[in-house]
């Protein structure tokens, strides 16, 4: 115990049958491409990575219990055909004893079987440390990228008509998200937004309103933001790039 380690890579790999196709995604929220396990060059795919095997089986490669570690992506092996290797986003400095994330292989006869058995991932992660989770209200979220008062109201109406529980106001409402000087306690002067009024309107429709805040503001203002947002009536915060 107490041994310092600097981890720069893993040797975890997954060899698939020849002819396997991958639903390749280069970055989070990027487009999916159905690709063979060849010709990727230095490109890497996000996780989870879903694969279509020649015999019709569906496979998903993913990770679980990633604690004090870095995320992994998938790249093709330069030496072994039809083989995917784990590529770490960066190096890891860690002190023993330690645990690396689970590397998970899910297999189903149909693609939907991967979803229907996703409790496997839940059970590989640690149990919730919160004694009371009754205040957490899960639901579907509709993103409003058009940051105008009337357009956000229209998004709230849209969500209410379609059984969507939340509307999310994305980046830009308090200023440029990448600037440390942007103040997430106020609406940017160039935005026609009355957030407390929008929260009241959303509540009248049975909708919760959420906002995006980049980590640059969060590290400076978190203790101020949370009580303020509660006062406004916001129901959640999307943390940017944590």
Model-inferred region functions:
Residues 14, 49-51, 59-61, 102-106, ...:
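Generic structural hydrophobic/aromatic packing signal, biased to beta-strands
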Residues 171-242:
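Aromatic- and carboxylate-enriched substrate-binding clefts and catalytic-loop regions
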Residues 18, 108, 146, 173, ...:
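Short, flexible loop/turn elements at secondary-structure junctions
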Residues 1-124:
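N-terminal accessory beta-strand-rich subdomains and adjacent acidic, glycine-rich linkers
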Residues 90-92, 155, 197-198:
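Generic recognition of flexible, low-complexity loop/linker segments
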Residues 98-166, 170:
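An acidic-aromatic substrate-binding cleft motif
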Residues 11, 48-50, 156, 199, ...:
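Short amphipathic alpha-helical segments and helix-helix/interface helices
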């Amino acid at each position: 115990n107490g041994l310092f380690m600097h981890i720069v890579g893993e040797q975890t790999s997954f060899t698939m049958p020849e002819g396997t196709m991958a639903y390749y995604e280069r970055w989070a929220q990027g487009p999916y491409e159905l690709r063979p396990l060849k010709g990727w060059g230095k490109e890497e795919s996000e996780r989870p990575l879903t694969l279509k095997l020649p015999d019709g089986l569906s496979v998903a490669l993913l990770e679980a219990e990633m604690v004090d570690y870095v995320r992994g992506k998938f790249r093709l092996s330069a030496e072994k055909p039809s083989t995917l290797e784990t590529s770490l986003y960066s190096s890891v400095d860690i002190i023993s004893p330690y645990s690396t994330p689970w590397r998970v292989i899910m297999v189903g006869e149909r693609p939907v079987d991967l979803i229907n058995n996703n409790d496997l991932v839940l059970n590989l992660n640690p149990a919730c440390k919160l004694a009371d989770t009754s205040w957490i209200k899960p639901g579907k979220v509709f993103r409003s990228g058009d940051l105008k008062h009337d357009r956000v109201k229209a998004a709230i109406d849209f969500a209410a008509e379609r059984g969507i529980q939340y509307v999310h106001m994305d980046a830009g409402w308090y200023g440029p998200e990448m600037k440390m000087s942007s103040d997430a306690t106020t609406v940017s002067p160039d935005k026609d937004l009355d957030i407390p009024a929008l929260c009241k309107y959303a509540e009248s429709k049975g909708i919760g309103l959420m906002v995006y805040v980049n980590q640059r503001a969060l590290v400076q203002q978190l203790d101020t933001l949370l009580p303020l947002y509660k006062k406004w009536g916001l129901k959640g915060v999307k943390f940017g790039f944590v």
